[in-house]
A protein has these predicted regions:
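A general structural motif at alpha-helix termini
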Residues: 182-185
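Extracellular glycan-associated modules
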Residues: 1-173, 188-216, 221
Length: 223
């Protein structure tokens, strides 16, 4: 955990209109969460998802994997200049698949989901398919995982906004599952929905931000 994040309450934060108790605010310059234990080791099939609120539009990492000795391999969800969401997966030999959304609005909450199933890559915005891509990317080697910044040879692309319910599965969720999961806390997931869940970072502990931040690297064993 770096540079203690601010926890926001949905009843006092303007514009908050999504189904969790709060969120973590990232300042765009130094805040990020270093996930010490990588939640994935096999990148054949997976799902990344989470609620995101963007204050600005530039290259900002929502969630992703990197390598501190080689900047080429990455697997991430980010917002780019032009306010487009990008799901990008690349190995050390630069074989990659990128899936871009149309421009989104700033100062608005979105539920963003990226799925990979074999060579099929899909990007969902608020439960609806935004764009797809296809390609073979050999299993990359990563040694970092972070929320709110891209951690590779150097730390870059700090996130400016709020995040909540960032989650990782070792399988590709279906469209129906995504539309169900987006409205639930981890405790409400069905047995089917929690199948393959590797980690869930609520980022919403209002009563005890310190306790919440200290426990965010744990796997979602309470699902």
């Amino acid at each position: 955990i770096k540079n203690g994040l601010v926890m926001f309450n949905k009843f006092t934060t303007a514009g908050l209109s999504f189904p969790v108790q709060g969120s973590a605010a990232f300042n765009g310059t130094s805040d990020f969460i270093d996930v010490a234990t990588l939640p994935l080791s096999d990148f054949t099939n997976f799902t990344y998802s989470g609620w995101a609120y963007f204050n600005t539009a530039s290259y900002q990492n929502i969630f992703g994997f990197g390598n501190t000795t080689n900047s080429t391999p990455v697997s991430l969800i980010e917002i780019q200049s032009g306010a487009r969401i990008n799901f990008f997966h690349r190995d050390a030999s630069s074989q990659s698949v990128g899936v871009l959304s149309p421009a989104v609005n700033l100062n608005q909450w979105y539920f963003i989901t990226a799925t990979k199933e074999g060579t099929s890559h899909k990007l969902y915005i608020d439960g609806s398919i935004s764009n797809t891509g296809s390609g073979s990317v050999p299993n990359p080697t990563f040694n970092t995982c972070s929320i709110g910044a891209l951690n590779r040879v150097s730390l870059t692309n700090y996130f400016n906004g709020n995040l909540a319910n960032v989650a990782i599965w070792n399988r590709a969720l279906s469209s129906d599952e995504i539309n169900s999961v987006m409205w639930k806390p981890v405790q409400a997931l069905s047995a089917t929905e929690s199948n393959g869940l590797q980690a869930w970072y609520s980022l919403d502990d209002i009563a005890s931000p310190t306790a919440s931040l200290a426990s965010m690297e744990q796997l979602a064993t309470d699902k």
